[in-house]
Amino acid sequence: MKVTLTDLSDIENLKKNLTDKTRVVYFETPCNPTLKLLDIELIAKTAHAFNPDIRVIVDNTFCTPYLQRPLELGADVVVHSATKYLNGHGDVIAGIVVGKADFISQCRMFGLKDMTGAVLSPFDAFLMARGLKTLDIRMERHCANAQKVAAFFTSHPAVAKVYYPGLDTFPGHEIAAKQMKLPGGMISIELKADRAAVAAALNKLQLCTIAVSLGDAETLVEHPATMTHSTYSAEELAAAGISEGLVRISVGLEDPEDIIDDFKTVLDTL
């Protein structure tokens, strides 16, 4: 198997890299952790125009089906880390693959039986079903809170940049308006500080929790350069748009003023 990495925010990059051997176009949107947005419909149309048999696979973890529905935009397969928003309570590790029946039957036969062998336990399945019952209510709250928290970050002098699809100034805001019901509960910010200062500041948070996961009821904060992307070289971090000052925030269900107060106390020290 050969994998080609390319920036799909420019559709010309996709066109240049499609070959007669291409079988899958795989991407996530919003992208982690920069929240760059990709046009699902445009990418799917371009790939299928080149070869209808190419499978377009979209990781929809950040949005869930409540905010974004890739299959309706032309994608063939959707994957979720169900550990995140779909479960929503931080107590299950699970994944979901969504697609046409013939494809899913292959996943069950060859993927589970011959390759991974992993299926959810009955109790984990119960917890997932429980979480899905409140998905719409939770996502509405995550998004409403994130919009308020993002607005606060835009006005704080310690913050150089705010990455949030709900801001008019965010590149790709038009794509969000086209394919997302709401802007989501994820925010990334660029702090005017070096790695040591950022770490010291984050360790002072009282309400918010430092953790690499996302989509929980609690607000979770992580420093990509030293946590989720710590294995990246300096060159790889730069190519991915990840600086030492970048902080990713999964805005939770708490009172938004409490979240803002926690961050204000910390950011005022920078």
Protein language model features and the residues they cover:
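Short amphipathic alpha-helical segments with coiled-coil-like heptad repeat character
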Residues: K148-T154, T209-I210, E257-D258
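PLP-dependent enzyme catalytic core of the Aspartate aminotransferase-like
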Residues: V3, E12, K16, D20-R23, ...
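A common structural junction motif
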Residues: M115-T116, L205-S213, V266-L270
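Conserved C-terminal alpha-helix-loop-beta "cap" of PLP-dependent enzymes
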Residues: K161-V247, V251
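Hydrophobic side chains in well-ordered alpha-helices
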Residues: Q106-C107, A197-A201, I259-F263
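Conserved PLP-enzyme active-site core in the AAT-like
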Residues: M1-A158, Y163, T169, E174
